[in-house]
């Protein structure tokens, strides 16, 4: 109960901050584009793409790929603390796998990016393990910010397509569960991550 209450408090704070900053924390774009990003937000983040890494990453991708070239679909899932402690929300992991599979089928010419932040990174790992190798072979790149599974390979993924961004001394990346200021600063890595994803898309 206390864990759930804390999660609700953090979500409310995140949404209030997003509103103040004018950041859109929800993205649902079913239409095919040159690049399709499937993104899972972190624990207790608002919307379906969150606040602390997703929106700045998408903006940087749009600059590099061109106006209208990037479509983003956020994963709808609980993003609870309990899910994080389970190694990534099981239903959310399955939902992400389903979105990726559907995107591969419906947009065969798109460059598909699987991405997530914090617990969203756990979902990337879990979804990749659920997907067949043939589907994963069609993924252009995988980008994780603040990965709780840092150092563990992503199943069925070509390592050259993977970028994991973890700051030195980051508690979550070290496999622990204490959220410190460093965990909230991944927006500063947006350009580097977008540069990687754009290069992979054009390879």
Swiss-Prot record:
PROSITE patterns: CUTINASE_1. Its EC number is 3.1.1.74. GO terms for biological process: carbohydrate catabolic process; symbiont entry into host. The active site is at residues 118, 170, 183. Residues 1-18 form the signal peptide. One of its GO terms (cellular component) is extracellular region. Disruption phenotype: Abolishes penetration of the host cuticle. Abolishes conidiomata formation on the host. Disulfide bonds join 32-107, 166-173. The 2 disulfide bonds play a critical role in holding the catalytic residues in juxta-position; reduction of the disulfide bridges results in the complete inactivation of the enzyme. It catalyses: cutin + H2O = cutin monomers. The record marks 119 as: Transition state stabilizer. Pfam families: Cutinase. It is an enzyme of class 3 (hydrolase). Catalyzes the hydrolysis of complex carboxylic polyesters found in the cell wall of plants. Degrades cutin, a macromolecule that forms the structure of the plant cuticle. Allows pathogenic fungi to penetrate through the cuticular barrier into the host plant during the initial stage of fungal infection. Belongs to the cutinase family. This is Cutinase pbc1. It comes from Pyrenopeziza brassicae.
